[in-house]
Amino acid sequence: LNGIVFISQALDYQGSTPYVRDNLISFITYVPTMAATALYHGRVEPAPESQAVFLQQAREFAINEYLPALFKGNTIDREEYLAVRNRLSYFTGLSTNYVDRANLRVQGNRFTKELLRDEGITVGRLDSRYTEEVVDQLKGSHFRVLNVASDADFAELRRAKQETYS
Protein backbone atom coordinates (compact mmCIF):
# COMPACT_ATOMS: atom_id res chain seq x y z
CA LEU A 1 0.00 0.00 0.00
CA ASN A 2 1.53 3.27 -1.16
CA GLY A 3 -1.29 5.60 -0.17
CA ILE A 4 -4.98 6.24 0.03
CA VAL A 5 -7.13 8.43 -2.16
CA PHE A 6 -10.34 9.67 -0.56
CA ILE A 7 -13.20 10.27 -2.95
CA SER A 8 -15.93 12.65 -1.76
CA GLN A 9 -16.71 13.94 1.67
CA ALA A 10 -17.49 10.48 3.03
CA LEU A 11 -15.33 11.06 6.10
CA ASP A 12 -18.37 12.79 7.60
CA TYR A 13 -21.13 10.79 5.97
CA GLN A 14 -23.82 11.73 8.49
CA GLY A 15 -23.14 15.45 8.09
CA SER A 16 -22.67 15.58 4.36
CA THR A 17 -25.14 13.14 2.87
CA PRO A 18 -28.51 14.20 1.52
CA TYR A 19 -29.71 10.64 2.09
CA VAL A 20 -30.16 11.19 5.81
CA ARG A 21 -33.71 12.47 6.23
CA ASP A 22 -34.02 16.24 6.76
CA ASN A 23 -30.25 16.76 6.77
CA LEU A 24 -30.10 20.46 5.89
CA ILE A 25 -26.33 20.62 6.39
CA SER A 26 -25.77 18.46 3.31
CA PHE A 27 -27.26 21.15 1.09
CA ILE A 28 -24.86 23.71 2.55
CA THR A 29 -21.76 21.56 2.13
CA TYR A 30 -22.42 21.05 -1.59
CA VAL A 31 -22.75 24.75 -2.53
CA PRO A 32 -19.02 25.51 -3.02
CA THR A 33 -18.55 22.39 -5.15
CA MET A 34 -21.62 23.18 -7.23
CA ALA A 35 -20.39 26.75 -7.64
CA ALA A 36 -16.96 25.59 -8.81
CA THR A 37 -18.59 23.16 -11.23
CA ALA A 38 -20.98 25.77 -12.64
CA LEU A 39 -18.08 28.19 -13.08
CA TYR A 40 -15.93 25.56 -14.79
CA HIS A 41 -18.71 24.80 -17.28
CA GLY A 42 -19.41 28.48 -17.99
CA ARG A 43 -22.84 28.55 -16.34
CA VAL A 44 -22.26 31.48 -13.98
CA GLU A 45 -23.57 34.78 -15.31
CA PRO A 46 -22.31 37.35 -14.98
CA ALA A 47 -18.94 35.64 -14.90
CA PRO A 48 -16.91 36.64 -11.83
CA GLU A 49 -13.55 38.33 -12.17
CA SER A 50 -11.85 35.91 -9.78
CA GLN A 51 -12.49 32.23 -9.16
CA ALA A 52 -11.11 32.47 -5.62
CA VAL A 53 -13.34 35.41 -4.72
CA PHE A 54 -16.37 33.74 -6.31
CA LEU A 55 -15.86 30.52 -4.35
CA GLN A 56 -15.38 32.45 -1.11
CA GLN A 57 -18.61 34.31 -1.81
CA ALA A 58 -20.35 30.97 -2.41
CA ARG A 59 -19.09 29.66 0.95
CA GLU A 60 -20.23 32.81 2.74
CA PHE A 61 -23.63 32.67 1.04
CA ALA A 62 -24.07 29.03 2.05
CA ILE A 63 -23.37 29.73 5.71
CA ASN A 64 -24.81 33.22 6.19
CA GLU A 65 -27.86 33.23 3.90
CA TYR A 66 -28.71 29.75 2.62
CA LEU A 67 -28.46 27.84 5.91
CA PRO A 68 -30.70 30.26 7.85
CA ALA A 69 -33.23 30.19 4.99
CA LEU A 70 -33.37 26.39 5.05
CA PHE A 71 -33.77 26.35 8.83
CA LYS A 72 -36.75 28.70 8.52
CA GLY A 73 -38.51 26.15 6.32
CA ASN A 74 -42.00 27.25 5.33
CA THR A 75 -41.89 30.22 7.72
CA ILE A 76 -39.45 32.08 5.45
CA ASP A 77 -40.97 35.27 4.07
CA ARG A 78 -41.39 35.62 0.32
CA GLU A 79 -38.81 38.40 -0.09
CA GLU A 80 -36.07 36.44 1.66
CA TYR A 81 -37.02 33.26 -0.24
CA LEU A 82 -36.67 35.04 -3.59
CA ALA A 83 -33.35 36.62 -2.61
CA VAL A 84 -31.91 33.25 -1.54
CA ARG A 85 -33.35 31.51 -4.60
CA ASN A 86 -31.76 34.07 -6.94
CA ARG A 87 -28.37 33.81 -5.24
CA LEU A 88 -28.49 30.00 -5.20
CA SER A 89 -29.37 30.07 -8.88
CA TYR A 90 -26.41 32.37 -9.55
CA PHE A 91 -23.88 30.27 -7.65
CA THR A 92 -25.08 26.91 -8.99
CA GLY A 93 -25.80 27.97 -12.57
CA LEU A 94 -29.26 26.41 -12.30
CA SER A 95 -32.42 28.18 -13.41
CA THR A 96 -34.56 29.93 -10.81
CA ASN A 97 -37.40 27.73 -12.04
CA TYR A 98 -35.46 24.58 -11.11
CA VAL A 99 -34.42 25.99 -7.72
CA ASP A 100 -38.10 26.79 -7.07
CA ARG A 101 -39.15 23.26 -8.00
CA ALA A 102 -36.46 21.91 -5.67
CA ASN A 103 -37.75 24.21 -2.90
CA LEU A 104 -34.20 25.57 -2.42
CA ARG A 105 -32.94 22.01 -1.77
CA VAL A 106 -30.67 21.13 -4.66
CA GLN A 107 -29.31 17.61 -4.24
CA GLY A 108 -25.91 16.77 -5.67
CA ASN A 109 -27.14 13.90 -7.81
CA ARG A 110 -29.84 16.11 -9.34
CA PHE A 111 -27.37 18.95 -9.87
CA THR A 112 -25.19 16.72 -12.06
CA LYS A 113 -28.18 16.02 -14.29
CA GLU A 114 -29.63 19.53 -14.35
CA LEU A 115 -26.61 21.81 -14.89
CA LEU A 116 -26.08 20.94 -18.57
CA ARG A 117 -29.48 19.40 -19.30
CA ASP A 118 -30.09 21.81 -22.19
CA GLU A 119 -27.02 20.36 -23.93
CA GLY A 120 -28.14 16.77 -23.31
CA ILE A 121 -25.18 15.94 -21.09
CA THR A 122 -24.61 15.14 -17.44
CA VAL A 123 -21.71 16.18 -15.22
CA GLY A 124 -19.45 13.62 -13.54
CA ARG A 125 -20.18 12.93 -9.89
CA LEU A 126 -16.62 12.11 -8.86
CA ASP A 127 -14.90 14.64 -11.11
CA SER A 128 -17.26 17.29 -12.38
CA ARG A 129 -14.90 18.41 -15.14
CA TYR A 130 -15.97 15.36 -17.10
CA THR A 131 -19.28 15.10 -18.91
CA GLU A 132 -21.22 12.34 -20.60
CA GLU A 133 -24.28 12.18 -22.79
CA VAL A 134 -27.46 11.66 -20.83
CA VAL A 135 -28.39 7.99 -20.86
CA ASP A 136 -32.01 6.92 -21.14
CA GLN A 137 -32.20 4.17 -18.52
CA LEU A 138 -35.38 2.82 -20.11
CA LYS A 139 -33.34 1.79 -23.14
CA GLY A 140 -31.25 -0.57 -21.01
CA SER A 141 -27.92 0.86 -22.17
CA HIS A 142 -27.05 2.62 -18.94
CA PHE A 143 -24.28 0.27 -17.79
CA ARG A 144 -21.66 2.25 -19.70
CA VAL A 145 -22.13 5.29 -17.51
CA LEU A 146 -22.22 4.00 -13.93
CA ASN A 147 -22.57 7.48 -12.41
CA VAL A 148 -20.28 8.71 -15.17
CA ALA A 149 -18.07 6.12 -13.57
CA SER A 150 -14.80 7.13 -12.12
CA ASP A 151 -14.76 9.73 -14.87
CA ALA A 152 -11.05 9.89 -15.69
CA ASP A 153 -10.66 6.13 -15.28
CA PHE A 154 -13.54 5.50 -17.64
CA ALA A 155 -12.01 7.79 -20.27
CA GLU A 156 -8.71 5.93 -19.85
CA LEU A 157 -10.41 2.56 -20.31
CA ARG A 158 -11.95 3.76 -23.57
CA ARG A 159 -8.56 4.97 -24.80
CA ALA A 160 -6.84 1.71 -23.82
CA LYS A 161 -9.57 -0.32 -25.56
CA GLN A 162 -9.09 1.63 -28.78
CA GLU A 163 -5.32 1.11 -28.66
CA THR A 164 -5.69 -2.61 -27.91
CA TYR A 165 -8.26 -3.44 -30.56
CA SER A 166 -7.25 -1.00 -33.29
Where are these regions (language model features)?
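A catalytic-pocket lid/entrance helix-loop region that shapes and gates access to the active site
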Residues: N2-T96
